[in-house]
Amino acid sequence: MLNLPHSPAADRNKQPILDALTRILDERGTALEIASGTGQHAAWFAAAMPSWTWQPTDADARSLPAIASRVEQAALPNLRPPLLLDVMAPQWPSQGPAFAQEDKEEEKFDAIYCANMLHIAPWPTCAALMAGAARHLRAGTGVLITYGPYFEDEAQHGPTAPSNLAFNEDLRARDPAWGIRRLDDVVAEARRVGLALRERHAMPANNLLLVFGFS
């Protein structure tokens, strides 16, 4: 077995996320994963949901060989080779043919999935993710699913977990452009491109899984 890059966090959260996905998603479809990282989620979800075709991507070209090796190791017909995709680029994917032309509905995605990206990327990445999702999701029925920590209205959801406050401080120290995002701000960016927050799922370790759909 190949010695592939491994994320302990991805191992911990892959099953709770899968449990949520199986409740949220339709029986079959095609999913685009943004910021696949090690590819652990892509391989796990594709194996558990054989009726869903999974397209992993990453903005870092250095990550693609390891993801490709994981795809090859999984040997699943519904798990595609990874593509280079930077959400800030005007074209998705960043190299090769564009995914979908505006008039080709059959080339759109039924789901776009993005885990643990928004807090380790500059804030404009959020707007770019929302705009790209609006372009590439199947009109009317497609959903954008994001996962990670968010700051919420404490009057509605209670005090912020100390672990999230400490994590945010650590992120800011590593890069001032990083940090846990306010959920209200993320929802506002979605609204600008015609997407609305449909579902909010509380997840382990003070994370949230959010589902956005066309408004």
Which residue stretches match the model-derived regions?
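Class I SAM-dependent methyltransferase Rossmann-like catalytic core
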Residues: 1-28
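Conserved Class I S-adenosyl-L-methionine
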Residues: 159-181
